[in-house]
């Protein structure tokens, strides 16, 4: 009963193979999946998929690499799509200083606006941050986190940074990057954070975990992330799966449904 809290079954790489991917995931114990739409094509495809499969949920937002195209019309579009009954969060939103497809000031403005929308809609928000941890932290700190909290997606910082985000009301989600040999800082965070503050994800088709590193990632491979973190923490994979799934269901508001 593993919950992949962040996957992109809605991208072109998986077109025509979604049934196969979902079946493989189920076979490997990944029984719930959150499909993240980050621009109009991926949002539309995500909504089509969640209407077809009971075990799929959807997160909708405007990715920081798309911040330059954020307009009032886009915001109206998002607000309309966020009404879908299987929407569990707003995202992925944040800052991306690696690609820098929009100026920092524009990314910050769009990030702040979407945090506010998430609070207005009583939804948790999912954060993408790349080469921008400090600014991401300061924006979340100044905007505040709503009662539903937020998720640091595919976390790649230190334990110290993870604890700072947790103190703001965020939960830390670990992807296949935690399995990489040189990811010792991320591994320390996955080992030491309180159990109720961690989630697991794939970010498929990106960032495949060991032993599949370098290949196309699959939502089924959440199993390898669970196995790795469970070993780090000295617990069984089943125990970690139960806890992280319960965490996801609580944050996404599925525990009361």
Indicate residue ranges for each PLM-predicted region.
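Mid-domain alpha/beta scaffold segments of enzyme catalytic cores
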Residues: 1-257
